[in-house]
């Protein structure tokens, strides 16, 4: 995945509505990116990159689209989780890999995509 989000189990348990609303918003953004061209996306975010030429920004976005860097749904699959941990390990940011079934909670993602 391009990115993943995490929270403590206690936070999730005590803030279920917030977690669901956040996940719904992420999914809405994922759908928007899927349904729009690189140029349209670049136009919508160009103000966040004032020193970047719109052509370069469009090219970068298209590159991400071409390699499927952005997931289309917020569900974190085992394969993506493993890849994320591998990247973090290679970067020296992760000492011990975590088991998927103990860490990942797709409950809110599954609800968002209904």
What kind of feature is each model-predicted range?
Residues 82-114:
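Conserved C-terminal helix/tail region of periplasmic/extracytoplasmic solute-binding proteins
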Residues 12-94:
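Secondary-structure end/capping motifs
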Residues 1-12, 23-26, 62-66, 101-113:
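Periplasmic-binding protein-like
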């Amino acid at each position: 995945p391009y990115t993943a989000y995490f929270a403590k189990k206690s936070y999730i348990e005590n803030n279920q509505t917030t977690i669901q609303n956040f996940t719904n918003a992420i999914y809405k953004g994922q759908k928007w990116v899927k349904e729009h061209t690189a140029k349209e996306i670049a136009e919508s975010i160009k103000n966040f990159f004032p020193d970047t030429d719109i052509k370069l920004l469009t090219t970068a976005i298209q590159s991400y689209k071409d390699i499927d860097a952005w997931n289309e749904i917020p569900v974190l699959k085992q394969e993506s989780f493993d890849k994320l941990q591998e990247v973090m390990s290679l970067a020296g940011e992760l000492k011990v890999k975590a088991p998927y079934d103990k860490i990942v909670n797709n409950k809110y993602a599954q609800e968002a995509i209904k």
